């Protein structure tokens, strides 16, 4: 185990070099996503002694800044090679790979811009923020990448056919896809490089010679078929997400697909997405599940801040008042209408209903629907409250009517305590609102009050009883008018006396009867009642009993 740990540390120290970074960029056409670069070199940065991790990360940042720049294209960060004029082709200085060259000179040749090319010379590392000088940058772009394929070819040779000194070399260099294929590397060469036969052979006990700086231990790992399938699916998912256009250019949906630098501790750019932080921490385990990882202390999870647009939206919507600033933010990003407050779970529609702002509620739904991002009118907060619950709770009847009639809110939705919106109405709320929200207590309002002894209204009584009451009152009034022939005489005279009209209105069948003076021309009503009525009127006029 100690020998394997030492080999892993040596591979990590040799693999993270400026030549390796430059070769990786050249293999991908001089431009690669920041996420791919970080996911490729993160196992090298985490391997080895945990105490030297910070130094390895600083060196890696310096290597990246020496040969490339970070650019953001269409919301995705790319690492692009520096544009330097190339001098005419001449004899290039390959990395020393012949027998007899010490490892110190090989490592010095791999990083010409960083160290002096003399054994034992003092190192003069550059700061990560300073760009490399003009004299050193072109030489790095020329000398370092050309020797990378040949050395990787030596590593990928089969275990049974090790390269012999002086033997013929294959003139055809392998392609980048073949170089990146880890299945061709045998298990015996996973952590060791080919021994270079020197004039002084190594003793039999030392079986692990120092690796060359351009070798990438990521390619030497032999993962199983499951790991290769997971890796292919992950790369396809990243490519699909990067090529997928977002609707209406929403900045909320344009999430960065790069692995966040803050999760790796590299600080090449500001962190944005917590989901990608988790992917960056789980990336090495997905790519190399068969390798043994050194036990390291878990890094504290950094707090993920909100984007400036989201933060401004949450602060302004909490006031519950519609403004031009809110309208502008919503026009730029329709997805903000569904953004929830992380403390209460309120959306902007919840705040509008709580404060009774009908214009804000209407504009939120209309603008979001026109932009292709419909708003859920029945969205629940952390307590299960819908906007209709909040409007009823705070006594905003107009907002509640707008939510139900115009926006289509459901009145039967219950919160997490099992209550519907009508149960939060204040005492004295209007009858129309209670009926709109489906209050079942309105049925008992029409029932007769048994405690007061009332007979109830006409609506609550039986229809037969209502018809009998109306018929009895109409018949009594009609018979009262016919029973008093004095009233008929006053009406015949044209209602000359005002008292006659008052007597007519106050007539009732129970009033005392007066003796009338019988005139010769007209028979009285009493005579008519005692006669037998022939013809079609027989049986229509009631007969009165004879006077006693």
Curated annotation (Swiss-Prot):
Where along the chain is composition biased (Pro residues)? 198-212
The gene that this protein is the product of is Sowaha
Organism expressing this protein natively: Mus musculus (Mouse)
List the biased-composition ranges (Polar residues).
136-153
Gene3D superfamilies documented for this protein = Ankyrin repeat-containing domain (1.25.40.20)
Cite the Pfam families for this sequence: Ank_2
SUPFAM superfamilies assigned to the protein according to its UniProt record, in alphabetical order: Ankyrin repeat
Q: PANTHER family annotated for this entry?
A: ANKYRIN REPEAT DOMAIN-CONTAINING PROTEIN SOWAHA, SOSONDOWAH, ISOFORM G
Task: Tell me the keywords, alphabetical order.
Answer: ANK repeat, Phosphoprotein, Repeat, Signal
Keyword Iron-sulfur part of the UniProt annotation: no
Which residues does UniProt assign to the signal peptide? 1-19
Q: What is this protein called?
A: Ankyrin repeat domain-containing protein SOWAHA
Q: Which InterPro entries match?
A: Ankyrin_rpt, Ankyrin_rpt-contain_sf
| Family affiliation | Belongs to the SOWAH family.
In this chain the ANK repeats are located at 344-373, 383-413
Q: Region Disordered: which residues?
A: 114-212, 512-548
Q: Where are the transmembrane segments?
A: none
Could you tell me the superkingdom of the organism this chain comes from? Eukaryota
Q: Which residues carry this modification: Phosphoserine?
A: 258
């Amino acid at each position: 185990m100690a020998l394997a740990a030492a080999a892993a540390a040596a591979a990590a120290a040799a693999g993270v070099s400026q030549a390796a970074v430059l070769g990786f960029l050249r293999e991908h056409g001089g431009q690669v996503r920041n996420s791919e670069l970080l996911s490729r070199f993160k196992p090298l940065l985490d391997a080895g002694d945990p105490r030297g991790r910070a130094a390895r990360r600083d060196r890696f940042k310096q290597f990246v800044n020496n040969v490339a720049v970070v650019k953001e294209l269409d919301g995705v960060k790319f690492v692009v090679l520096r544009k330097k004029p190339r001098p005419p082709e001449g004899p290039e200085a390959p990395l020393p790979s012949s027998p007899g060259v010490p490892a110190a000179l090989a490592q010095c040749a791999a990083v010409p811009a960083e160290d002096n090319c003399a054994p034992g010379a003092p190192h003069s590392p550059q700061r990560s923020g300073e760009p490399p000088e003009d004299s050193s940058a072109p030489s790095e772009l020329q000398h370092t990448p050309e020797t990378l394929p040949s050395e990787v070819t030596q590593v990928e040779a089969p275990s049974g056919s090790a390269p012999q000194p002086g033997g013929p070399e294959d003139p055809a260099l392998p392609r980048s896809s073949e170089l990146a294929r880890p299945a061709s590397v045998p298990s015996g060469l996973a952590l060791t490089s080919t021994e270079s036969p020197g004039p002084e052979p190594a003793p039999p006990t030392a079986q692990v010679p120092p690796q060359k700086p351009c070798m990438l231990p990521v390619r030497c790992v032999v993962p199983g078929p499951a790991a290769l399938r997971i890796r292919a699916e992950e790369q396809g998912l990243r490519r699909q997400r990067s090529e997928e256009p977002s609707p209406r250019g929403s900045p909320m949906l344009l999430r960065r697909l790069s692995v966040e630098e803050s999760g790796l501790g590299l600080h090449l750019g500001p962190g944005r997405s917590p989901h990608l932080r988790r992917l960056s921490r789980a990336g090495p385990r997905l790519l190399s599940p068969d390798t043994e990882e050194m036990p390291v202390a878990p890094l504290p999870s950094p707090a993920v801040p909100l984007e400036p647009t989201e933060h401004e939206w949450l602060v302004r919507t909490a006031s519950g008042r519609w403004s031009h600033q809110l309208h502008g933010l919503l026009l730029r990003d329709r997805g903000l209408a569904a953004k929830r407050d992380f403390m209460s779970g309120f959306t902007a529609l919840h705040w509008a209903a709580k404060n009774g702002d009908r214009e804000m509620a209407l504009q939120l739904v209309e603008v979001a629907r026109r932009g292709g991002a419909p708003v859920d009118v029945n969205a629940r907060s952390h307590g299960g409250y819908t906007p209709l619950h909040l409007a009823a709770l705070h006594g905003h009847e107009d907002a509640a009517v707008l939510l139900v009639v115009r926006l289509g809110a459901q009145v039967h939705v219950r919160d997490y305590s099992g209550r519907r919106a009508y149960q939060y109405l204040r005492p004295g709320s209007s009858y129309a609102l209670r009926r709109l929200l489906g209050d079942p207590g309105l049925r008992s309002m029409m029932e007769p009050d048994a405690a007061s002894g009332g007979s109830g209204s006409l609506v609550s009584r039986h229809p037969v009883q209502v018809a009998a009451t109306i018929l009895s009152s109409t018949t009594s009034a009609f018979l009262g008018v016919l029973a008093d022939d004095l009233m008929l005489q006053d009406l015949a005279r044209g209602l000359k006396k005002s008292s006659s009209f008052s007597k007519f209105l106050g007539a009732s069948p129970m009033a005392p009867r007066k003796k009338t003076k019988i005139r010769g021309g007209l028979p009285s009503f009493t005579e008519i009642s005692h006669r037998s009525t022939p013809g079609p009127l027989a049986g229509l006029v009631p007969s009165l009993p004879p006077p006693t």
